[in-house]
Amino acid sequence: SLAITSADVREVLAALPADLEQARKDTVQTALQLVGKVNYFWGGKSRAIGWDSRWGQLTKVWAAGSSSTGTYRPFGLDCSGFVDWIFNNSQGYIIGHGGGVIMQHRYCTNISQTEAQPGDLAFYPDDSHIGIIVGRNEAGKLLVCHCASGQNNVVVTEFGASGFTVVGRPDIFDP
């Protein structure tokens, strides 16, 4: 299963490097709070600080470009909306200023998987999906927290196995 349990979330948090800067820890902790709790919703964005009371309410999908457009689904976040909410809640900053994955990627510097740290961003090769790197598994593979349409929720999956190929370091974390 791609979903992780509360115990797994605690394990990921416990495995964060001791010398990881606090801003990155805050980003990872904020991301992991939503695992299994917020539905995927095409076009879903939130500027709420903390839990958004709209999440879970049956809402018409208004954004064009999805097979779910025009249908009613529980409101939640899309992948870029998830990243916006995480950075807004952990850093008071909306990466890419709400412009979606392509804009979010423009506010990053591409780095190697080896250089990746918790809090960096993971992208699909065509910038069609984004997530937040939250650590590494026992095998050293990157773990990514993202709001996934396929699982209709916030999940943590392995970087390469779930289609991610590019790592971006958000400008907010650049020295």
Model-derived features: positions:
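Short alpha-helical basic/polar micro-motif
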Residues: S80-G81, H129
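Residue-level marker of positions within ordered structural domains that often coincide
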Residues: G36, F87-N88, R136, I172
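N-terminal capping segments
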Residues: S1-S80, N89-S90
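A short beta-strand micro-motif
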Residues: A122-Y124
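Residue "hotspots" at secondary-structure boundaries inside conserved domains
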Residues: F75, T114-E115
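Aromatic- and glycine-rich peptidoglycan recognition patches
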Residues: Y93, G99-Q113, D126-P175
